[in-house]
Amino acid sequence: MQNNLKKEGNNPDIFLLIKGLTSSEKSYYKKMGKRHADQNGSLHLKLFKLIDESAIINETELCNALEIKNKIHFSGLKAYLHKDILDTLVFHKRNVSVDTQLYFMQEQIKTLQEKKLLYLAQKLCKKAITLSMQYEKYHFLILLHHLQNKVLEYKDYKQFKDSTDSIFLTLKNAIDLHQVYVENRFLYEKVRLLTYRSWLPITTEELEEIEKAKILLNKMKPANEKQPLISLFHLNTLALCQYMLHENESCTNTCSRIYNLWNNNTHLVNEYPLLFLNSINTTCYNDFLCNNIPNAEENILTYGKIAKAYLKNEIYFKHFEVIQFNTQLKVYLKTAQFEQVKLLINKKAGTIFNYSAEILSPAEQLSIKGSVCISYFVLEHWDEAESLLSVIKEQNQHINREDILYFSLLFFPVILYEKKEWDRLDSALKSAYHFLYARKKLRPFERELMLFLGHLSAAESKRNSNQLINNFLERMNDYRNDPDRNLYFLYFNYYGWLESKLMNLRYMDYLKNRLKPLEGTGEMLVKSSK
């Protein structure tokens, strides 16, 4: 829903917060709010109801409805409602989020200690320590050990002396583990952000940056089997580095270790959902890069079983559904199941786009739109492909994903070629060429392909076209046969598309012809383009 927030003098904060609540969260807040309201008629609950039922924000009308004439009074009411909603949401999560549980337990322990109820405090502290160790919440573990140590002040000297060494050794171990965790998580976040620039690094500078991260990772102290969370951060960082350095066999092995860790520590899935989802993404991206389509299908299936059983947070499960959709769509495309491609897009694309806008970063949304755009192209829905590509190009102006930039600039002329819009094609090629040249981003592959498409569109006969294509494909063999430069064909197989023209085949039929049966099975494996 598009909400009108532009009216001068309106503060949209509380409006956005209330409109962003789920139906269950709204019901819970109303239920909790009535417990503390005076005869269920407190102004903050009335304001909540008015905003919830409003399509636009108009603070003058809200003040009139509440019979409030003082702006300071209204500002205070909004601030109170804002805080009360957030406090209630946090309280609502106390039995779902381990972080929230530990926070409440920590405050309860402090309260018990202040009241000198030391036995109860110590009992609760031990329970909280066990929970923090199970979920590797090292920050809380350190704080809880400090709280536990306060009990020493109430022991006699002999008890104090007997306990001190053991307690402080335990505290030191917790601090050491926290340091290892922080270092691994820091590097993971740093490497993960590189994928926001491009999932397909090719230039020497990009590869050198990732290589440095991998060297730093290898110098870190590895976790042992008792710290699966630290191991998951460490291995996910390693897998990302291996994927972006095109070390695909090693990445496959690392991804297998990651899956085994998740499968053996399913209690961590809902507590660290983004790490879990990133594991799936990296695994499937690597499968497609290795051209192992059956493996990609198997991995999304096995991870899906874990997600359905243990990923309880609705937001993150939607995120999984987006990844699942994108993976399945690529599987159907690469195995030439075009009716399934069409059915999947017609049935789910709209919902997935809504989920993406709701939960994904702008950079991640582009990957989903790109997959659907290519699907439209393969299905020969040229107008839909062009329309969606225009959206991708516009959004990427603010995001600047390098891989999407090159993809959109090259794929647009290909669409126009299929539409036989020669004037627009000529204009698009000149515009893209000058855009990249002016920014010193014109790489040899893009330069050659754009110049070739310009010559191809001007060819006077089929014979001339075929000769141009033959000559160009011979030059492209240098890219196709190089394990790194072959990645230029990863997002879209320009080589195969041109081969289909040479063979006078629809691109769909060309892709079907490229399939070969796996020996002893009914499955199909796409022939390598290397």
Regions found by a protein language model. Give the residues of each.
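Flexible inter-repeat linkers and adjacent short helices
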Residues: 1-213, 222-225, 434, 449, ...
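"A position-specific structural signal for the A-helix of alpha-solenoid helical repeats
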Residues: 100-103, 107-110, 140-143, 147, ...
